[in-house]
């Protein structure tokens, strides 16, 4: 049987493909969202370092953050962003495929209670 990684390699699955699939899916559900660009151009940083690739609002007002990955792992700043979202009742989904987003949305809506940072 072929693995997910082997299938992605065969069809040339990239992180941009995942972002496009996820955004199309969120559109189909009527979820307000946008692509969140971050980076550096010359000497100027833009965006919030570590923030998710796609940010949105679910119908109940819950903040949605989707980090898309293909071959790489989350950076330290991305893990910190995830913790901040989850600690404040947001829904964070780490997505290697569209199925990860579908599963996250189905299981989501049950974010953790906020933790006090002392």
Residue ranges of predicted features:
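Catalytic phosphate/metal-binding cores of nucleic-acid and nucleotide-processing enzymes, i.e., regions
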Residues: 1-118
């Amino acid at each position: 049987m072929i693995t997910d990684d082997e299938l992605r390699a065969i069809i040339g699955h990239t992180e941009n493909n995942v972002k496009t699939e996820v955004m199309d899916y969120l559109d189909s559900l009527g979820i307000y969202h946008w692509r969140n660009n971050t980076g550096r151009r010359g000497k100027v940083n833009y965006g919030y370092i570590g923030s998710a690739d796609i940010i949105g609002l679910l119908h109940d007002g819950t903040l949605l953050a989707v980090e898309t990955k293909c071959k790489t792992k989350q950076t330290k700043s991305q893990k910190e962003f995830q913790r901040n979202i989850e600690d404040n009742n947001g829904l964070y989904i780490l997505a290697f495929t569209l199925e990860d987003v579908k599963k996250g949305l189905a299981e989501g809506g049950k974010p953790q209670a906020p933790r006090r940072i002392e």
